[in-house]
Amino acid sequence: MKVLMVEHFLPGSVYTLELCRALRTEEQITIFCRKGAPRPLEGVQWKDKLYAGGKGRAEALMRYGGGLLALAAEICTGHYDVLHVQGFKDARYEIPLYCKLKRHCGILVHTVHNLLPHEASPRDRRLYGDFYRVCDLLVVHNLYCRQLLMDEYHLPPEKICVTPHGSYTQISPKEHQLHTEKTEFLQFGVLRRYKGVDILLEALARMTETQRSRVHVTVAGQQFPKLDATDYAALIREKGLEGCVTLQLGHVPDEALDALYQEADFCLFPYREIYGSGALLMAYSYSKPVLASSIPAFEEETDGGCTGLLFPPEEPD
């Protein structure tokens, strides 16, 4: 079976690499990705023709459009049995493209990492709904997302496949001894308001000085002002947390990310909402205990708190 896997966010999307590593023994896999993204993966064909970013606005639009034209040509001429879409760089253009080209592929599959953008407008809801209805199969990672799709878009249950998020096999957790002087906590991922970094900082501010002297928290990840304009550095200073919080903004390379997880005693997820979290599975892959808010996705993915400590959402205490 010929499968075309479309992924805009390689090489950062370890999930897609792991999926293709598993599928390649049974299927003929081609990954359509952005320029410079291919990684050594025996048995997988790469086509890096999508826009990789980093140009001026006019040239960026031309290169982005050129990448979509190349993708359309691949779908129309590649004779693929399955077109598997992992995500969108700009759904406004890509969803109509997939809907129009569906007749050129056997089965259209989409992994629903996020049911909707976190700041979804009514137009977004209609756009994503159109795409979900056109797809032949939707893959979700928990029952919570399956039910949301059925409730929001009235999709039949047989169209939605619940496949638990796999662990990251490239990770080799080292034997770890808990820190005796200060317990190390880590919150990793792109900074967004729904991830509750402000809740975490307020919780630390409510601790006594003696309690804070025994902990150290690292908040690491990229921050895009259009998605979250909060000045977390100022918030840390305002709450007097400079001595126990390290804010590490920007892209975290693989080696540095590995060091962050290896060093952590616990991983933190004080989220307000989420459809599913790859970062939570990353923590599990490193054999790290997790502290997470008791929102539906985390309730399910921690087996009701059996594999993680849960606390009420938006509750610093």
Roles of regions detected by a PLM:
Residues 36-37, 216-230, 250:
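Glycosyltransferase donor-sugar binding loop
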Residues 259-275, 288:
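Acidic donor-binding loop of glycosyltransferase active sites
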Residues 4-7, 71-92, 107-109, 266-269:
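Short N-terminal targeting/anchoring amphipathic segment
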Residues 230-251:
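Nucleotide-activated donor-binding/catalytic signature segment of Leloir-type glycosyltransferases, i.e.
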Residues 133-151, 155-171:
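Donor nucleotide-sugar binding/catalytic pocket of nucleotide-sugar-dependent glycosyltransferases
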Residues 178-195, 201-204, 217-220:
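Conserved donor-binding/catalytic core segment of Leloir-type glycosyltransferases
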